[in-house]
Amino acid sequence: MFGGYETIEAFEDDLYRDDSSSELSVDSEVEFQLYSQVHYAQSIHNANKEEGYEEKNCENSETVSSQPNQKNLIVLSDSEVIQLSDTSEVITLSDEDSIYRCKRKNIEVQAEEKTQSPATSHSNKVAQKCKRNNKKPKPEERPGVIREVMIIEVSSNEEEESTTSENENVESWMLLGSEEDGKDNDILLNLVGCETAGAEDDVNWFISDKDIEAKIDNNRSSGRWNNRYYSVNKNVTCRNCDKRGHLSKNCPLPQKVRACCLCSERGHLQYGCPARYCLDCSLPMSSNHRCFERLSWRKRCDRCDMIGHHADACPEIWRQYHLTTKPGPPKKPKTPSGQSALVYCYNCAQKGHYGHECTERRMFNQTFPTSPFIYCYDGKYDIQQRDRRIKRKVKDLKKNGDFPRQFKRPHVEETDKRRHHDMRKSRSPRKYRRWPRENKETQKEKTRSREGKTHRRGHQPRGEDEDFPRGSKPNASGCANNQKPSKSLHHASHYHRLREERLLRESKRSKPKKRKSTEDGSHDDLFLIKQKKKKPKPSGL
């Protein structure tokens, strides 16, 4: 078929008088020319310089004859011509950190196959020539943009089959400008100068002057003792030791134990406090506590019309004393205070309503909201009626045994004792300056002597004593009571009278104890007393 030649390659070698055999694979020189056209640039300015350098190299390289009108054509082989549009752009690559990053890519390639005369150079070697347009850039194009040149080689059917087999082994990550892969997220792009900072907002951040003066760092330390050696010049105060120069988290002293908000004692919190009170009856909760009050959410106040309490426990009772400075009924304002124009809610922070009127969910559900207004002021009669109701309630609690016991608070009792002791010292010389106190023994002796004097003055005749050994007649007792008191009692002060009456009551209370011990021999004593007082009658009578 080929005129005695075995293959078409041998026929072509004899036809073109070429000693070298035709090869399907790409020649090493062609591969070198292809790789030499890949440009690397760190920034746009460097890319422009390299573009001019490449133009000089292309002029000195081997050239292939082409038509004068085809300025933007690249001859790849004897029968292949590829035309590139002027709007195409080149991929810019950064070789600084061996990381390739694509800036822009807009490719519009139009392939046109044209035949040429067979009087060309060798078919096995592909000649390549770069011709660039040296004209000024069009207004549509931006200055300093690097174009992308993609070189495509079209060969025969056998060569196409070989290239397709080679392309099957090429993966997506090997191609420049391909789609993003999930494995590429681990690559760190350390490029400086390639991107513009035009998209960032021009925001000026600054540090407050107070933070600078206090010299407080925003970086938290990993351990507690890292900042142990602090400087005293810092304007901060520790809440643990009350010393300046460091914070409580860096304090070398042990942390204080939190105090209870109910009894102000340390060692327990609110939920474990022994003085914890019941939310329904407001009494301390003990082990045997029994609450007979209605549940708090079923109570409604007749005074402020709020849920959670009764009228006697309404917070308006103490709120009405906002103008009172003297003891007595609360003072009323001359003109009623109107509602302010600016109204905000403490629960939802919205404008237009108060916190007790808010319908949103409460931040703290343990208490019920109360009204901040005062609807009425109490008078003397209202205060007296409320005190009577409270006393009646206390009596009922004492009867049932539900009255709260007093909890011992050592630090409070010590302060109270000191205050009372100081008050006694200060008041004793003024109160008892004229009438100093006497001992109990001297007081008892005086009372006995006075009782003896009154008994002698009201002494009955001997006959009456005989007839009435256990006591005198009622008339005699009446005479004794009608006697005038001694002069000393008239001259005594009112204070001495009260003191004497009190001592007499104490002596009367102590006498029955002695009588109980002598009840057994009372009859014998009376018989002996009667015989002793009995005297022999005169015989003449």
UniProtKB/Swiss-Prot annotation:
Q: Locations of Polar residues compositional bias?
A: 116-126, 474-486
Composition bias of kind Basic and acidic residues appears in 435-452, 498-509, 517-527
* Zn finger region (CCHC-type): 236-253, 258-275, 299-316, 343-360
The entry's cellular-component GO terms read: cytosol; nucleolus
Report the main location listed first in the record.
nucleus
Q: Quote the Gene3D superfamilies the UniProt record gives.
A: Zinc finger, CCHC-type
Identify the stretch(es) annotated as Disordered: 111-144, 394-541
* GO molecular function terms attached to this record: nucleic acid binding; zinc ion binding
Mark out the compositionally biased spans (Basic residues).
Answer: 418-434, 487-497, 530-541
Keyword field: Isopeptide bond, Metal-binding, Nucleus, Phosphoprotein, Repeat, Ubl conjugation, Zinc, Zinc-finger
Q: Which residues carry this modification: Phosphoserine?
A: 477
Q: Where is this cross-link: Glycyl lysine isopeptide (Lys-Gly) (interchain with G-Cter in SUMO2)?
A: 129, 136, 138, 234, 249, 334, 408, 431, 473, 484, 487, 530
Q: Which domain of life is it from?
A: Eukaryota
Q: Does the keyword Chaperone apply?
A: no
The subcellular location is: Nucleus, Nucleolus
The residues forming a coiled coil are none
The residues forming the signal peptide are none
User: Assembly and partners?
Assistant: Component of a nucleolar TRAMP-like complex, an ATP-dependent exosome regulatory complex consisting of a helicase (MTREX), an oligadenylate polymerase (TENT4B or TENT4A), and a substrate specific RNA-binding factor (ZCCHC7 or ZCCHC8). Several TRAMP-like complexes exist with specific compositions and are associated with nuclear, or nucleolar RNA exosomes.
Protein's name in the database: Zinc finger CCHC domain-containing protein 7
Q: State the organism of origin.
A: Mus musculus
